[in-house]
């Protein structure tokens, strides 16, 4: 569990990357500004995550907003089902190529190759805990460097990967 003190230090170190500053691509800026760093209370927030700790609630709300934007039919996730279903009522959970949420422990080479083989240009991958250990950091750097990935966002608590090859490969650090 990350302490509140460390949370503030992370936030201060990343404050230059707040609210999309430095992002030149209009699509990427819009994603950061209106999905990642959206601060409006959505209609479902009042009934979601009351018993969750702050990080689970923060990530759950992020996945809610991503799901609300993407409207996927199938999501691959072992957790956060309430948040995802609140954003998209008809969503199913299982093996997906649209929206995949995995913990860093499941990011071994074989798992990533399987994911890379099934994703398309509109797919989104979220890797949780990208800074939890030295090995997690290395895996995240490998994902960023992989030629099969496109635009990546480092939110400290998780990393978001897009696979659209029509866009320039970019890596953004975002104060989330």
Per-range role (PLM):
Residues 1-121, 131-176:
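A short alpha-helical cap/connector motif
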